Amino acid sequence: KDGEWFKCGVKDVRSAINNIRERKFSIETRGLNFKMRPEQKAAIEKTFNYFQNYKKENPDKTPHFLWNAKMRFGKTFATYQLAKKMGWTKILVMTFKPAVESAWDDDLKEHVDFEGWQFVSASENTLWHEDIDERRPFVCFGSFQDYLGKNKSTGGIKTKNKWVHETKWDCVVFDEYHYGAWRENAKELFEAEDKEE
């Protein structure tokens, strides 16, 4: 106490080392600075090229791309790197498996590559949509069950989720989609999109 020794964790030490190495001095504790693996770089490059070419050939349609990635591929990290490369600033991540939220949150908040990015969800320990700084990139995470759920009294969109439906997203990511792809909500979502296109 009141000396030159301070209690801290490994994460704090890594963050301090990274900040000194990169001559950055930030309040945020970002202890991760690993680089992309070759298979992640290849997936990002392939996806980037597909999106660029698709938009040229189909300017009025929305491109879709599936990463059929193995376990431990690092989809969250690779998705964020793709978002940076594409220049996306508003990313919606929807899942049928809400337990994966921490992976999306941790990669965004702890890796040095995503400094300044914001993570929004309905969880208590994250930013709320009212607090988003629109000048900075943000990722909104939520479950299909919540975002596609109906207001019981009106039959319409839940009031708390209205902003999600009204936002023009640069990218919508479906994570762990196979857990609920067969459900009616998911089918209705894609049938409505196909009609619009």
Residue ranges and their predicted role:
Residues 72, 76-113, 146:
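Conserved Walker A/P-loop ATP-binding site and its immediately adjacent core
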Residues 112-156:
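Inter-Walker segment of RecA-like/P-loop motor cores
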Residues 54-82:
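Walker A/P-loop
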Residues 64-66, 90-92, 138-139, 171:
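Residue-level preference for the first positions of well-ordered beta-strands
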Residues 2-38:
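Non-catalytic accessory segments flanking enzymatic or RNA/DNA-binding domains
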Residues 82, 103-111, 140, 172, ...:
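Alpha-helical scaffold elements adjacent to nucleotide-binding pockets in ATP/GTP-utilizing enzyme cores
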